[in-house]
Design a protein with these regions (language model features):
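Signature of Asx- and small-polar-rich beta-strand/turn repeats characteristic
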Residues: 180-213, 234-271, 356-360, 365, ...
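Acidic, glycine-rich low-complexity segments with interspersed aromatic residues
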Residues: 40-44, 132-209
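Short, intrinsically disordered N-terminal pre-domain segments
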Residues: 1-32, 44-48, 133, 143, ...
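N-terminal intrinsically disordered, low-complexity, charge/repeat-rich segments that act as generic
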Residues: 1-39, 43-46, 130-136, 224, ...
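GIY-YIG-like beta-to-alpha core
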Residues: 229-230, 486
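Elongated alpha-helical scaffolds
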Residues: 210-229
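Aromatic/pi-system hotspot detector in well-structured domains
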Residues: 174-176, 225-226, 270, 324
Length: 604
């Protein structure tokens, strides 16, 4: 079955993403999407290996694990951390170098001392394996288990509004060294399949669809123009190089139509689309992409107001022909389902066409033809003075039709806006401390419609904390970020990893400890146990040896979260909403005096 998913579908989805940010009567309406940009993963990337069916001998940090025969093993690595059902690994090696991997269900063995050492007796069966290092983050997985992990490692989230998102398109600057020639808009580009049976039409730069064409440009004043004509004629079938930078300033620009016409060189015709305002330049202009302004932008609205459905702007000479009335300037009506269109063309002494242009744009055309038979040619634009045409006269002029609605009527569709860029600025400890500044993160993403913690109510706040927190009193020393913390609790031991430690103003012993708990690193007898509001059982740091008690009397808001009996939950309900975008990155380090502008480009 022959079928395609068209670019229009992708453009539609990009439009829907942006429109969903403001739809509905209020912030909690079902029509509106509450999108949040989140950061997470404070702990370093290491290779991850699930294990099961362990024997009674434990794997040891610093020892190796391997599969097969040690001297010729297909996989071996150094143990960096040991969990109940997984290992973190470094220094991966084997028959395929760092790309070596233990097949699912492999017999895994522990070893100390390397080639001169011996097996430790520790064994297990291998499960899912994912290679990663700080320089090579793992590819995200699109499954439910991964989603649970995203929430466990989430640090904070910031609301995405329409002020932080734009449709973007590929960036093409006015630069005649990098971009000497541009494609022109045509409605009928297509590919020529390798198997035959179809002959398509390519653009000047070899693209097989308008979606892949280089047919627009941003000038030095951040004005965006679309190329309607690039000098194509029978002698230059792929067009010619541009010579003049299009601009809305000067005599070559016609404000009544929004067209800029070159008066030198190939005679390029450009359609003005919009001007990117300074704020959008700063937020959404990158080395690869440039924004389409919002519909409310004044320059865009002016362009939309000029759009005329089915108006014709370009006439191409397909075949210069011969035998037409010689050495004349001639006019003919554009035949089709529209009205008012007129083509003007000039012939030489042999009756061949030497130039052609649109005299009157007309409107309403979805197909168009230019006829040269007797009775169709005139010597004046009013089409009142007929010129006889001989029976042997031949030639061909193509009228290039605009997109539906006319040029400038639908910017996203016309410019192939199938990508959305979000630009999120994290300013210091944004959200009164929701975004800690004393740690780093390695994951960014977007979650749609998360709930407030402990509810089924959509979150609407500007920022949300994804961390658990405890108010500490009587700390013996400073806790260290990324260290493991423990507390004796009912039924066993609670474990966590420190994300942030912030002393109270003027204190050296009291502060807020923010942490994560994951199902891999923080289980006790198969269970992730919660830290308790117990002033007698201290919380202790593994590497710092810091020890402090829960301030069970504390019940105020501090650093973006609200405490009850010294404990504070995240502000995001675990596993709520839909994670629609995830990107694993190298570490991004935060600092108290630092601002990050993070750009995400989502292609639909």
């Amino acid at each position: 079955m022959a079928a395609i998913i068209s670019d229009k579908f992708r453009i539609f989805n990009a439009k829907q993403f942006l429109e969903s940010l403001t739809e509905g009567p209020n912030d909690t309406s079902a029509e509106r999407s509450r999108m949040y940009f989140f950061v997470g993963r404070p702990q370093p990337w290491k290779a991850y290996l699930e294990i099961h069916t362990k024997n009674s001998t434990a794997f040891v940090v610093g020892n190796e694990v391997y599969v097969g025969t040690y001297g010729s093993t297909a996989f071996r690595a150094t143990v960096a951390a040991v969990y109940d059902s997984a290992l973190l690994l470094t220094d991966v090696f084997g028959s395929n170098g760092v790309n070596s991997a233990p097949p699912l269900g492999s017999a895994l063995k522990g070893r100390s001392g390397g080639s001169g050492g011996s097996d430790t007796g520790a064994t297990a069966v291998s499960g899912v394996y994912r290679y990663a290092t700080e320089d090579v983050p793992p590819l995200p997985l699109d499954n439910q288990t991964e989603k649970y992990g995203l929430y466990d490692e989430m640090i904070a989230a910031k609301r995405i509004t329409d002020a932080f998102a734009r449709t973007v398109i590929r960036r093409y600057n006015w630069d005649l060294v990098a971009n000497p020639k541009f494609d022109m808009w045509k409605p009928d580009y297509s590919a020529t399949p390798g198997g035959g049976g179809q002959i398509g039409k390519q653009t000047a730069t070899g693209a097989t669809s308008i979606a892949d064409a280089k047919f627009y440009v941003m000038n030095s004043s951040y004005e965006v123009f679309k190329c309607l004509y690039n000098g194509e004629d029978p002698s230059n079938t792929t067009g010619q190089n541009a010579t003049e930078e299009p601009t809305t300033a000067g005599a070559n620009y016609a404000s009544a139509t929004g067209l800029y016409t070159e008066t030198t060189g190939a005679g390029y015709i450009w359609k003005y689309m919009y001007t990117i305002p300074t704020d959008d330049v700063l937020k959404f202009l990158s080395s690869d992409f440039m924004p389409i302004v919002l519909p409310a932008n004044a320059s865009r609205q002016a362009t939309v107001a000029l759009a005329t459905a089915g108006a014709c702007d370009v006439a191409l000479i397909e075949n210069a022909g011969s035998g037409l009335p010689a050495s004349q300037t001639l006019y003919t009506s554009i035949k089709g389902d529209g009205t008012g269109g007129i083509v003007k063309f000039v012939t030489n002494g042999a009756g061949a066409i030497t130039s052609a242009e649109i005299e009157a744009r007309g409107s309403g055309y979805t197909y168009a033809n230019v006829l040269f038979a007797n009775g169709n040619l005139f010597s004046n634009a009013a089409l009142s003075s007929a010129v006889a045409t001989g029976a042997s006269a031949v030639g061909a002029i193509e009228v290039v039709l605009p997109p539906a609605g006319g040029h400038g009527s639908d910017h996203e569709t016309e410019l192939n806006g199938k990508r959305v860029m979000t630009n999120i600025r994290l300013t210091y400890s944004e959200g009164q401390g929701d975004f800690p500044v004393d740690n780093d993160f390695r994951r960014i993403g977007i979650v749609a419609d998360p709930y407030n913690y402990g509810t089924t109510t959509f979150a609407t706040a500007d920022t949300l904390s994804g961390l658990k927190s405890v108010k500490i009193t009587g700390a013996s020393a400073d806790f260290s970020v990324d260290e493991k913390i423990t507390q004796t609790v009912t039924g066993g031991t609670a474990y966590g990893t420190v994300v942030s430690w912030t002393l109270d103003s003027g204190s050296t012993t009291a502060g807020v400890l923010k942490y994560i708990q994951t199902t891999d690193a923080h289980t006790d007898q198969g269970v992730v146990r919660a830290f308790e509001s117990n002033g007698s059982n201290a919380i202790t740091g593994e590497s710092s040896t810091a020890s402090g008690n829960v301030d069970t009397s504390y019940g105020s808001s501090l650093l973006g979260v609200t405490f009850a009996s010294g404990l504070a939950n995240p502000e995001i309900e675990n596993n709520s909403g839909n994670v629609i975008y995830v990107e694993n990155r190298r570490l991004i380090t935060r600092a108290p005096d630092q601002i990050e502008d993070i750009k995400l480009v989502i292609e639909f």
